[in-house]
Amino acid sequence: MSRYPAAIDSALVGTYPAHTKSGGGYFYDDVLEFRVWCRPWQGAPDEFDGEIYYYAFATYEQAKAFSDVTAGSEQPLVLVRQREWIDEPVSNQFIHKRGERLTEWLVEWLLDGKREEQSIELFMRQGGGL
């Protein structure tokens, strides 16, 4: 059993936009895919005229296995969907946001970041403490 949840819909893995937000939000609603970014100038195969590119996977284990054997690749990141999140425009100023936001996260943030019904309310009541 994995420490991390798999993509919510494996049929959609690889169809999400490459350019998304990066980090932030404190909470996530859905795991969309795990990404391994490849850099040709660091030894990855040059598949896109020297440009950075990624491979998408449904599980962390698939992404990690690929990353471990692919020269010039980064450690896996996870693409998450946020329907509600915390914006922190300046340090310790927290704003509850709603909508749909796609963002890449460090995989380990999944361990404590799944949004439950009261997660954001509790976060705000505690002044930003988790």
Description of each model-found segment:
Residues 79-130:
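Active-site and NAD+-binding cores of ADP-ribose-processing enzymes
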